[in-house]
């Protein structure tokens, strides 16, 4: 997966070491994933390192990116997996 080098508004999904999924929002994708892996990200991912970026989507504005994050977090686990598969993400070994 090629990560964009420019800042923007991004919704992203991480696969944690325990095979759980975490959705977030950022303006700097590379920095945010690095921070998650250093234990400086969300409390949820701090105990589930390392994390792997498996999906991201860019938006024109902060509101839309944050809305995508909110909608993802409201989904059930099975719905999150369906969303990722629909967007071309192949998931194996997920609990």
Swiss-Prot record:
**Identification of the protein by name:** UPF0213 protein PEPE_0875
Q: Where is the GIY-YIG domain?
A: 7-82
Family assignment from sequence similarity? Belongs to the UPF0213 family.
Q: Which organism is it from?
A: Pediococcus pentosaceus (strain ATCC 25745 / CCUG 21536 / LMG 10740 / 183-1w)
Tell me the PANTHER family matching this sequence.
UPF0213 PROTEIN YHBQ (PTHR34477:SF1)
Q: Give the Gene3D superfamilies listed for this entry.
A: GIY-YIG endonuclease (3.40.1440.10)
Native organism taxonomy:
Bacteria, Bacillati, Bacillota, Bacilli, Lactobacillales
Query: TM segments?
Result: none
């Amino acid at each position: 997966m090629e990560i964009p080098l420019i800042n923007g508004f991004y919704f992203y999904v991480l696969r944690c070491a325990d095979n759980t999924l975490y959705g977030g929002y950022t303006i700097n994708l590379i920095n945010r994933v690095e921070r998650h892996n250093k234990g400086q990200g969300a409390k949820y991912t701090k105990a589930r390192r390392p994390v792997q970026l498996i999906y991201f989507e860019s938006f024109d504005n902060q509101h839309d990116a944050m809305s995508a994050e909110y909608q993802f977090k409201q989904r059930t686990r099975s719905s999150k997996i369906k969303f990722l598969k629909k967007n071309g993400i192949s998931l194996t070994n997920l609990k």
